[in-house]
Curated annotation (Swiss-Prot):
GO terms for biological process: photosynthesis. This is Cytochrome f. Heme binds at Y36, C56, C59, H60. It is found in: Plastid, Chloroplast thylakoid membrane. The lineage of its organism: Eukaryota, Viridiplantae, Streptophyta, Embryophyta, Tracheophyta. It comes from Vicia faba (Broad bean).
């Protein structure tokens, strides 16, 4: 009987320990994983909506600039660089998930035309490899090699990101043509304000959920605040929880209104999107253009020679 009780107690303790560890993992892991741009693909088949808006803007609410530079034209089956610049003030610090201040990270999504894709390592020149460094690029989906995602990576080191791109060859891909194609880019700096599941991060403004008077504000042991608002109309108490990070703006006894900001806006980052155009050039057209230019130059040379010959004939006739 005692042995059975001992086994039962051990079983309960093991189950309880596993449950606690699982809860700790879920609580601590979720905010970190959701911060990666690649996790945005869980809710969107395509990162660019029909309106042209890139879905990263759903989580990164502030509007910031981004720039992309690509060659004007490129030949088939050629590796070229798409340089994405994500500028921001290197001196600013962002609010981390634990409420402390830290350096900003950056991320980007590059939407290429169908057929264009990330260049394989064996096609990269030493110069491009040096520019890429230790960056690790990923496809938005295994079936969408033309959409490339990177980040988050340290912003101080990678505010300029070089994407090595391989152009397609219409000779081997029938759905690719020698045309002018658009390229779209989205770039983030800093953490988002909304997680992909719709919940707010601590990198956000927190507003009052009721109109009334701030009756009590309690600073939590691990950071953040618990704000008690007493509704003046019915005396009902409403408690607003402020996570670590945002700076509290209200004090006890202060009258506030519904949706009034309780905290400052800690966000120093944001998202921007841009576009560029690139021409997939037919080598035969280039050769034809070169031959045409060469023929014009030769024609000019022959014209000059003919003119000089004519002048000599005229001069000789005048001497007679």
């Amino acid at each position: 009987m005692q042995t059975r009780n001992a086994f039962s107690w051990i079983k309960k303790e093991i189950t309880r320990s596993i449950s606690v560890l699982l809860m700790i993992y879920i609580i601590t892991r979720a905010p970190i994983s959701n911060a990666y741009p690649i996790f945005a693909q869980q809710g969107y088949e395509n990162p660019r909506e029909a309106t042209g808006r890139i879905v990263c803007a759903n989580c990164h609410l502030a509007n910031k600039p981004v720039d992309i530079e690509v060659p004007q034209a490129i030949l088939p089956d050629t590796v070229f660089e798409a340089v994405v610049r994500i500028p921001y003030d290197m001196q600013v610090k962002q609010v981390l998930a634990n409420g402390k201040k830290g350096a900003l990270n950056v991320g980007a999504v590059l939407i290429l035309p169908e057929g264009f894709e990330l260049a394989p390592p064996d096609r990269l020149s030493p110069e491009i490899k040096e520019k890429i460094g230790n960056l690790s690029f990923q496809s938005y989906r295994p079936t969408k090699k033309n959409i490339i995602v990177i980040g988050p990576v340290p912003g101080k080191k990678y505010s300029e990101i070089t994407f090595p791109i391989l152009s397609p060859d219409p000779a081997t891909k029938r759905d690719v043509y020698f045309l002018k194609y658009p390229i779209y880019v989205g770039g983030t700096r800093g953490r988002g304000q909304i997680y992909p599941d719709g919940s707010k991060s601590n990198n956000n403004v927190y507003n009052a959920t009721a109109t009334g008077v701030v009756n009590k504000k309690i600073r939590k042991e691990k950071g953040g605040y618990e704000i008690t608002i007493v509704d003046g109309s019915d005396g009902r108490e409403v408690i607003d929880i402020i996570p670590p990070g945002p700076e509290l703006l209200v004090s006890e006894g202060e009258s506030i209104k519904l949706d009034q900001p309780l905290t400052s806006n800690p966000n120093v980052g944001g998202f921007g999107q841009g576009d560029a155009e690139i021409v997939l050039q037919d080598p035969l057209r280039v050769q034809g253009l070169l031959l045409f230019l060469a023929s014009i130059i030769l024609a000019q040379i022959f014209l000059v020679l003919k003119k000089k010959q004519f002048e000599k004939v005229q001069l000789s006739e005048m001497n007679f």
